[in-house]
Amino acid sequence: MKRIKLTVAYDGTNYHGWQVQPNADTIEGELNKAISELTGEQIEVIGASRTDAGVHALGNVAVFDTESRIPGEKFSHALNQRLPDDIIIQKSEEVDRDFHPRYQECRKTYEYTILNRRFPLPEYRNTAHFDYGNLDIEAMKKACKAFIGEHDFAGFCSAGAQVKTTVRTIYSLEVECMELGGVQRENHAEKKTECEKISYDVNIKTGEEQENNRLVNIKVDEERENNRLVNIKVDGGQENNRLIKIRVNGNGFLYNMVRIIAGTLLEVGKGNVAPEQMEDIIKSADRKEAGPTAPAKGLKLVEIRYV
């Protein structure tokens, strides 16, 4: 009997999470079926992280015991021939029989992706949370500092979680912003004449649902001749068109903890919570003080590194 470790990547869109459930498609269920078919044994894998419905992974870990004579490193190719296209074994290897993916000391890295622009993009519909607000990235980065270190994260855990302790250590928490490119809105009419030029800024409160009734600054350049308007140039400014990634590394995470961290940082970005409040929110250990749980589709388990 030998123990095989699998590094698993998957798109969680079409699955009811990792853990086997009756009458539901799950990642664990698909792995059990493929491995059992390959080995001729009744296999049940043990997973490191039981991700929720809609959550994705680049490097979740699972193990199973088998008497198969297939070399450990060969399982990845053989299983990928049997698994659906949205589940891929990145690596397979034989490990010590006492290796346990859930109880072994490790560091986990998660990433939460936000598409920040006026309208959604179809290619990100299953892998990023869409937010059209004018998010303050610097404020979000500043708020990250309060999370670093060992804290009681009871306020960042969904109700019903059964754990011995809510104390966890976060080694790093970063907010990265990648511009996708912008669209400059500009309307103007021109007339060649000697005239007075006037520039001023106008704040317009939009009524469009997509703009969330927020104030939008517009720059206006007027040209006047004998107090008569002969030319006007309106510059609507640069629309947000970016991907924001919240990346966190820690020794373990409570139920929905990363999604609640992401939801809280979004509240900071929107100006609803000041970065300076974050330390008190964590110390309160009160779920009501933290932000909402961000949607599952933006979350991805990037890596589990055993130490």
Label each PLM-derived region with a short phrase.
Residues 1-207, 215, 229-307:
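Structured-RNA-binding interfaces characteristic of tRNA pseudouridine synthases
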Residues 221-222, 235:
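Repetitive helical segments and hydrophobic/amphipathic motifs
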